[in-house]
């Protein structure tokens, strides 16, 4: 495993200055924003495709700082009822997939999106309460008429370019838990995988370890951030809290640094479970805390997570190195 960071947390620096900062911090990989809501300061696929000779130079710049590219970032609003927004995302997505094939990159992290609740609606509609039949009908319409047609089409585009869609299970999104992610995977095929962000499990009341076992090899990329739960707010608001994230003192929970909401033992179990399930890619830091300055947050996050990373393959077992007969001579002839 390697410790990475999202390029959004480096945008205060010029490109190479940011890569140097990340390397010196002990970071080994960068998840690079390329389309959707991500900034383009570290990757602009449209510009690079227009001057293809620059692609190798762009890749070489990361290598010169001993940094891998763990994925491209494409979080956006693909199912937005506003056609202008949705069409622009689709255009950027197609360009990004084309660029990824030329650059030899395989993973894109992204959101599945949130559509309207019925034909002609102008606002997205997140259905999480299905006691009433009309809400169940709304959810079925969203899956059958919007989510599945879109990602069948765009999943084929990605697959044609050798790209894996690493969907993040996120509140306010059609794909927000392991069951919905697995359902999408079953519907559109192996092009659909998971970008596992443990923080989104905690505020939804999902056991992250059980979620990892449920998803298994579908986990193809990992984010690392924590949540801090405000007990006195949570007791009266519940965890599905619509208070603005900027009003963090009034919320039931807020994003925080790894280790600042859940203890080291919890994070050790998370990292160990990833290894047990065969994950050996990047754990990508996100500094999204509203009450930390970005660089301080990154530095504290690296200091906490770096010692927990399992960096080397397991290799020879300890008892093999010791020259022991593990069977203890108890095998029957």
Can you annotate each of these PLM segments?
Residues 2, 29-30, 72, 140-260, ...:
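Acidic/histidine-rich catalytic cores of soluble enzymes
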Residues 5, 22, 30, 62, ...:
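Conserved, mostly hydrophobic/aromatic
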Residues 10, 284-294, 322:
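A short, acidic, flexible beta-alpha connecting loop/helix-capping segment that sits on the rim
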Residues 11-22, 58, 87-98, 204-213, ...:
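Short, acidic/polar
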Residues 16-38, 103-107:
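Catalytic domains of carbohydrate-active enzymes, especially glycoside hydrolases
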Residues 17, 61-65, 79-193, 268, ...:
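Active-site acidic/histidine proton-transfer and metal-coordination neighborhood
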Residues 33-58, 112-119:
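Glycine-rich, proline-tolerant flexible connector loops at the mouths of alpha/beta enzymes
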Residues 294-314:
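C-terminal helical cap(s) of enzyme catalytic domains, especially alpha/beta-barrels
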């Amino acid at each position: 495993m390697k410790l990475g960071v999202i390029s959004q947390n480096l945008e205060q620096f010029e490109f190479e200055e940011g890569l140097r900062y990340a390397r010196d911090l002990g970071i080994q990989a960068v998840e690079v924003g390329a389309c959707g809501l991500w900034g383009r300061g570290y990757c602009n696929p449209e510009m690079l495709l227009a001057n293809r000779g620059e692609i190798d130079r762009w890749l070489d710049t990361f290598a010169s700082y001993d940094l891998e590219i763990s994925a491209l970032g494409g979080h956006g609003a693909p199912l937005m009822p506003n056609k202008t927004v949705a069409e622009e995302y689709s255009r950027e997505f197609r360009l990004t997939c084309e660029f990824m094939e030329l650059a030899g990159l395989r993973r894109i992290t992204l959101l599945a999106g949130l559509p309207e609740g019925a034909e002609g609606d102008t606002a997205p509609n997140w259905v999480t309460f299905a006691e009433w039949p009309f809400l169940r009908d709304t959810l079925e319409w969203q899956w059958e008429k919007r989510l599945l047609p879109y990602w069948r089409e765009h999943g084929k585009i990605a697959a044609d370019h050798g790209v894996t869609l690493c969907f993040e299970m996120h509140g306010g999104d059609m794909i927000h838990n392991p069951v919905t992610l697995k359902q999408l995977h079953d519907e559109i095929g192996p092009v659909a995988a998971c970008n596992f962000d443990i923080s989104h499990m905690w505020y939804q009341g999902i056991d992250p370890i059980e979620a990892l076992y449920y998803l298994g090899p579908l986990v193809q990329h990992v984010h690392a951030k924590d949540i801090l739960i405000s007990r006195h707010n949570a007791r009266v608001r519940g965890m599905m809290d619509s208070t603005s994230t900027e009003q963090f003192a009034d919320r039931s929970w807020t994003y925080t640094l790894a280790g600042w909401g859940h203890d080291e033992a919890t994070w050790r179990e998370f990292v160990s479970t990833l290894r047990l399930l065969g994950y050996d890619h990047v754990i990508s830091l996100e500094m999204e805390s509203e009450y930390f300055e970005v660089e301080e947050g990154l530095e504290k996050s690296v200091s906490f997570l770096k010692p927990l990373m399992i960096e080397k393959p397991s290799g020879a077992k300890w008892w093999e190195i010791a020259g022991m007969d593990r069977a203890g001579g108890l095998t029957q002839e």
